[in-house]
Amino acid sequence: MSASEFDDRFVTVPLRDVTKVPSHERAGEAMNIIRQHLAKQFAVDEDAVRLDPSINDAVWSEGNNNPPRKLRVHAGSFAEDGETVVEADYEG
């Protein structure tokens, strides 16, 4: 794989919209917002975004009702089987 096929960046994902859903659904909605934000930043489908379990741990660290207001992730996109895939890790 050449360097031009790999796109690596740090992305800060704002999670302020998570307050628009009921408190008992906030951590799950935060995970959806992270996936949507990364898909938009890298211009791929949401199905092509792979989130590391460390992101899940960071979102759920304060429980379901109180996810963080923003999250910094390290994301990289690369070609796999002819499709672009994005993998993201928590940058804490």
Swiss-Prot record:
Source species taxonomy: Archaea, Methanobacteriati, Methanobacteriota, Stenosarchaea group, Halobacteria
Q: List the disulfide bonds.
A: none
Set out the biological process GO terms recorded for this chain's protein: cytoplasmic translation
CDD domains, alphabetically? Ribosomal_L31e (cd00463)
Name the family. Answer: Belongs to the eukaryotic ribosomal protein eL31 family.
Keywords of this protein's UniProt record, alphabetized?
Ribonucleoprotein, Ribosomal protein
Q: What is this protein called?
A: Large ribosomal subunit protein eL31
Q: Which domain of life is it from?
A: Archaea
> Gene encoding it?
rpl31e
Looking up InterPro entries in the UniProt record yields: Ribosomal_eL31 (IPR000054), Ribosomal_eL31_CS (IPR020052), Ribosomal_eL31_dom_sf (IPR023621)
The record's Gene Ontology cellular component field reads:
cytosolic large ribosomal subunit
Gene Ontology molecular function: any one: structural constituent of ribosome
